[in-house]
From Swiss-Prot:
The gene is aspS. Coiled coil: none annotated. This is Aspartate--tRNA(Asp/Asn) ligase. It is an enzyme of class 6 (ligase). HAMAP family: Asp_tRNA_synth_type1. Its EC number is 6.1.1.23. Keywords: Aminoacyl-tRNA synthetase, ATP-binding, Cytoplasm, Ligase, Nucleotide-binding, Protein biosynthesis. PROSITE patterns: AA_TRNA_LIGASE_II. The record marks 75, 125 as: Important for tRNA non-discrimination. Homodimer.
Length: 642
């Protein structure tokens, strides 16, 4: 009985689920028979090449390919198939009138196909420069449909599919050339890192996933213990104390690609679980770690991107904040922040005078060609500054002939406006944007505006990678909400030597001036890695915990094991952690971490594919001694009603 399209063929739509067909069109009563025959084919003929690996050097060779049907084109006497696997696509030519390739009549998108054939060079005029295998095609000798596919919810090659749909069917999206390339790059980076660090004397050591709750700023993911009722593990936010314990243990060069977990609000470049390239070294100083990591960076960029990275410049935290308003500046473009204090002091403009009297700042930037901004565009920029925390935004526009207009024209003379405009870096045809507020708020607002202008005005060269070390971070920062000093990085970061005694002596007057032996590696406005020299003396670590407001009881409960370890000959040590996901994101030139993770979460920390997190039954909760709160019960009830 010939196999033809029609009612019988629609098994792939679920109408004849118990019927399948062999290549000769025979109806088989069970899928088990088909599976056995398919596996016999796979056992007899092993794949010899990936689809995307073929080129003219293989012309004339017999090959066996296995993959998915990307596109099928029926030309009557011949059927053309674009066969896809993780390495790419190749065109396969089949004759549907031959028994060995008769099944080509029945192929549809995403069917799994095995092909034995001969590689042929395409004739001139028939080559496809859009794909890397475009100079060749495979002339099929025989083929086998290894499995059928339901009609997919979207074409794998379609780049305009709603992201939520792609995440729900992530296994289909992962077949795309885009995501295949990203995951292959990720693998290459992991292999490079392991090879480089191993060659430089590092040992890869795995640390526990079930560990003690030692909060590092974000909330912990907690895991109840069944065998120890009322007790909890925490999924580690980082292996911080563990890698320091390895230094105490004598493993003086450690690394791992560590899984980390943080229960925090998400952004485009954040996930609740993530990977970091974690390393620690003993008997070193800050320069040693920075030098080692520059070498690693150069190795990665040379081998993955073919780019030679030169010397990486350095900038202090204070300079980064003053010039760019942020501690991870994108230095691919200018539009730097300028200080207007000397110009506007005593100007009589109450807004500026009041801010300066409170110890605030008045600073501005110049938007290139912003002199043509409409009132609506300026209102949009003002709203943007307000969302960043600023009270408002002053603008000064210049026409092409240099004529100025401003939102504060009635408060300043034309000469003073011109002076302010020029101080912001403005030229004819530009627009100066000025913020007056406390230091942190003004920096945040101007940084937000600067990055917006960089993107909107196409000031950023996306083909460039601009690296930067940011150093000399504050050790501490004051939290108005908590009314106490908190660690800028984490409580294990060492102060610079000149501040160590102030820390031990609880010299509160020096807290705001203390600098840390900390360093961040920045690329294109992203913090790619961050680290520090660690506190390695017990009395300094205890002083840090006291400064942070931790009682002796709390310190012992959370970190008693670590303080005890510091008593037993701890060497000077330090380290760094790179965000693996962010690193690959930059290398793949995408702006979303979800694009470089196989199975990512959404911005609400959910997995649409597996529908998790999900409700568990009450027996499971009872086993681990957990009972849902009234709020959680109400949430579940509301979900069931919706």
């Amino acid at each position: 009985m010939p196999l033809v399209e029609g009612p019988l063929y629609r098994f792939c739509y679920g109408e004849y689920k118990n019927m399948v067909f062999d290549c000769n069109g025979t109806i088989c009563k069970s899928g088990a028979h088909e599976q056995g025959r398919h596996m016999k084919f796979v056992k007899e003929l092993k794949r010899t090449h990936y689809c995307g690996s073929l080129g003219v050097s293989q012309a004339g060779q017999k090959v066996v390919l296995m993959g998915w049907v990307d596109v099928r084109r029926d030309h009557g006497s011949l059927v053309f198939i674009d066969l896809r696997d993780r390495e790419g696509i190749v065109q396969v030519v089949l004759d549907p009138n031959k028994a060995e390739t008769a099944s080509s009549k029945n192929l549809r998108g995403e069917f799994v196909l095995a092909v034995e054939g001969v590689v042929r060079a395409r004739p001139d005029g028939m080559k496809n420069a859009k794909i890397k295998t475009g100079e060749v095609e495979v002339e099929a000798i025989r083929c086998e449909i290894l499995n059928e596919s339901a009609v997919p919810p979207f074409q794998v090659s379609d780049t305009n599919v709603n992201e939520m749909l792609r995440l729900k069917y992530r296994y289909l999206d992962l077949r795309s050339a885009r995501l295949s390339s990203h995951l292959i790059t990720r693998h290459k980076v992991a292999q490079l890192v392991r090879r480089f660090l191993s060659d430089n004397g590092f040992l890869e050591v795995e640390t526990p996933i079930l560990y003690k709750s030692t909060p590092e700023g974000a909330r912990d993911y907690l895991v109840p213990s069944r065998v120890n009722p009322g007790h909890f593990y925490a999924l580690p936010q980082s292996p911080q104390t563990l890698k320091q314990l390895l230094m105490i243990s004598g493993y003086d060069r450690y690394f791992q690609i560590a899984r980390c977990f943080r229960d925090e609000d998400l952004r485009a470049d954040r996930q609740p679980e993530f990977s970091q390239i974690d390393m620690e070294m003993s008997y070193i100083d800050q320069e040693d770690i920075m030098e080692m990591n520059e070498k690693l960076l150069r190795t990665i960029w040379k081998e993955i991107k073919g780019i030679d990275v030169g010397a990486i410049p350095r900038m202090t935290y204070q300079e980064a904040m003053d010039r760019y308003g942020i501690d991870k500046p994108d230095t691919r473009f200018g539009v730097e922040i300028k200080d207007l204090k000397s110009i506007v002091t005593g100007s009589g403009f109450k807004v500026f005078d009041d801010v300066l009297a409170r110890g605030g700042i008045v600073r501005g930037i110049a938007a290139p060609k912003g002199g043509s901004y409409s009132r609506g565009q300026l209102d949009k920029l003002t709203d943007m500054a307000k969302r960043a925390g600023a009270k408002g935004l002053v603008w000064i526009k210049s026409e092409a002939d240099g004529t100025l207009s401003s939102s504060v024209s009635k408060f300043f003379s034309p000469e003073k406006l011109a002076e302010m405009f020029k101080a912001c870096g403005g030229e004819a045809g530009d627009c100066a944007l000025v913020v007056a507020d406390d230091y942190d708020t003004a920096c945040a607002a101007l940084s937000t505006l600067r990055l917006h202008l960089g993107r909107e005005l196409n000031l950023i060269d996306n083909s460039k990678y601009k690296f930067l070390w940011v150093v000399d971070f504050p050790l501490l920062e004051y939290s108005p909400d908590e009314k106490r000093w908190v660690a800028r990085h984490h409580p294990f970061t060492s102060p610079k030597d000149e501040f160590a005694q102030d820390l031990v002596n609880n010299n509160e007057a020096a807290y705001g001036k203390m600098l840390a032996k900390a360093y961040d590696l920045v690329c294109n406005g992203y913090e790619m890695g961050g680290g520090s020299i660690r506190i390695y003396r017990n009395e300094i670590q205890q002083a840090m915990f006291r400064l942070l407001g931790m009682s002796e009881e709390e310190t012992q409960h959370k970190f008693g094991f670590f303080l005890e370890a510091l008593k037993y000959g701890t060497p000077p040590h330090g380290g760094i952690a790179w965000g693996m996901d962010r690193l690959v994101m930059l290398l793949c030139e995408t702006d979303a971490i979800r694009e470089v993770i196989a199975f990512p979460k959404t911005a609400k920390a959910t997995d649409l594919m597996s529908d998790c997190p999900s409700e568990v039954n009450r027996d499971q909760l009872a086993e681990v001694g957990v009972r849902l709160s009234t709020l959680a019960e109400k949430h579940l009830e509301d979900l069931k009603k919706s």
